[in-house]
Amino acid sequence: MTTITITRPDDWHIHLRDGAQLKDTVRDISRYMGRAIVMPNLVPPAIDTETALTYYDRIKAQVPAGSQFEPLMVLYLTDKTSPDEIRKAKASGKIVAAKLYPAGATTNSDSGVTELKNIYPALEAMQEVGMLFLVHGEVTDSSIDIFDRERVFIENILSKIVADFPELKIVLEHITTKDAVDFVTQASDNVAATITAHHLLYNRNHMLAGGIRPHFYCLPILKRNTHQQALLAAAASGSKKFFLGTDSAPHAKDKKEAACGCAGSYTAHAAIELYAEAFESVNALDKLEAFASFNGPDFYNLPRNADTITLVKKPWNVPATYPLGDTNVVPIRAGEAIDWQVE
């Protein structure tokens, strides 16, 4: 039986939701992740320090007994985010980053940024105090094809931010294209990226060929196979610029299986197991630990986790659904096998 032991991993991008759903999402991700960067796109969003810290308390209240899981909080940037709010958030010790959602780009992003210049004072403060800048890298112009929105964002927006704020640490989140891989690789050491398990394992054929599979529908959308291969190569390259971020984003079953379904794929039930499959597919299990456990904390200037987990190559069948508050979520690989499990 094949086993691998790695330093306990972290998730550098997750959606835990709120209310009744929180106990289920926290239960799933805290099983083996030491920390997680928690997205602030709630309703209403966590646009100030106080809101983010009360959300932190709600998450901590759901952490199972015996778990050392620690949520790392994020401020939701708006056109009105002030430099003082950035300094206050940084001083809290619990808010480690602020997030750019272009208005309308993804779930609960309606309060997001409408003009880049509106957040320049906040970005200057972030650069000054050492707060990380997390980016959902898609334009929202309806005339731009949905498969091109990441590339156009990089060309027209991100390249300018990187040039204007050379000392700002930036994470381009959930990258999905070779264009993003190339940009991050060629940028300074202050630019990094997270990659999801589902973008490593799947491409748009899995979502669209032979019938529409709504549980693969996420934003940024799955791209063609050539982009998937570029992501796999980047993750397995050993580069310190790429690290684990699940972007696990639960929606109720009826919100996904609908005439106008929500964007988001749920992977918190088996995140590291799915990443192990992806790395094994390119004969790179020896690179998994750095990607999952080292590169993220190193980029955030946080200590690596001190303990370990052991993965065993032993297939198990994923349930058709998991509980999600007063409803259910259909996870990635529902009703099918995953090759790895945590011992």
From Swiss-Prot:
Catalytic activity as recorded in UniProt: (S)-dihydroorotate + H2O = N-carbamoyl-L-aspartate + H(+)
Q: Which cofactor does it need?
A: Zn(2+)
This entry's comment on the bound cofactor is:
Binds 2 Zn(2+) ions per subunit.
**One annotated GO biological process:** 'de novo' UMP biosynthetic process
Write the record's keywords in alphabetical order, separated by commas. Hydrolase, Metal-binding, Pyrimidine biosynthesis, Zinc
E.C. number(s) listed in UniProt: 3.5.2.3
Q: Which residues bind substrate?
A: H15, L16, R17, N41, H136, L219, H251, A263
**Which CDD domains does UniProt cross-reference here?**
DHOase
Q: One Pfam family name from the record?
A: Amidohydro_1
Q: Which residues form the active site?
A: D247
Spell out the PROSITE patterns in the cross-references.
DIHYDROOROTASE_1 (PS00482), DIHYDROOROTASE_2 (PS00483)
According to the UniProt record, list the residues that bear N6-carboxylysine: K99
Query: Which GO MF terms does the UniProt record name?
Result: dihydroorotase activity; zinc ion binding
- The disulfide bonds in this chain are none
Positions binding Zn(2+) 2 in this chain are K99, H136, H174
* Chain residues that bind Zn(2+) 1: H13, H15, K99, D247
Q: Which GO terms describe its cellular component?
A: cytosol
Source superkingdom: Bacteria
**Which InterPro entries would you find in this protein's record?**
Amidohydro-rel (IPR006680), DHOdimr (IPR004721), Dihydroorotase_CS (IPR002195), Metal_Hydrolase (IPR032466)
Which pathway does UniProt place it in?
Pyrimidine metabolism; UMP biosynthesis via de novo pathway; (S)-dihydroorotate from bicarbonate: step 3/3
NCBIfam families to which the protein is assigned, alphabetical: pyrC_dimer
Q: Which family does it belong to?
A: Belongs to the metallo-dependent hydrolases superfamily. DHOase family. Class II DHOase subfamily.
Protein name in the entry: Dihydroorotase
Phylogenetic lineage: Bacteria, Pseudomonadati, Pseudomonadota, Gammaproteobacteria, Alteromonadales
